[in-house]
Amino acid sequence: MSSFKDLKKNRMSNLESLSKQVEKLIEKPTYGDDRIWKCERDKSGNGYAVIRFLPAGQNEDVPWVQMWSHGFKGPGGWYIENSLTTLGKDDPVSKANTALWNSGIESDKNIARDRKRKLSYYSNILVLEDSANAENEGKVFLFRYGKKIFEKITGVMNPEFKDETPMNPFDFWEGANFKIKIRQVDGY
């Protein structure tokens, strides 16, 4: 049990501790994940990086994870959550969207369109070149990407034409570097 003498002696350290707690409350929360790498843009809106997709980890079948998510603004604020359909389960938002879509009412269909789930893929990558953040070079990160990049990956694995040789872009030794080029065009 603390005595008054101890309380008086420790009052400044208690003040410091309380001040730190107040600072934590005032700080705006960050929702970013330091494990996920993003190609940063320069002041003109352009970005460039070279990455290497890494093979699947031990006990993993494929070197990517497919993730469905919802992100929309409703009457009570923003709803940003991963969809349960990622786990093969029924998702309440997807069920509600289906009901809205099947109503046949165009305004309901528009709501369902705004709330539809979005597909992302995640893979481990090695950053070989990062023009905006050189300190990332040589480090391993998670990389979140969409359908278009996934189609490029599957395109080299299963080429469309006979004269193209299939390649595993996730092969550590014989894979390929992947160049990311982001260009600002007409304000977009």
Show which residues each predicted segment covers:
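OB-fold ssDNA-binding interfaces and closely related basic DNA-contact patches used
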Residues: 2-169
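Short, charged beta-turn/beta-strand-edge "cap" motif at the junction between a beta-strand
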Residues: 181-188
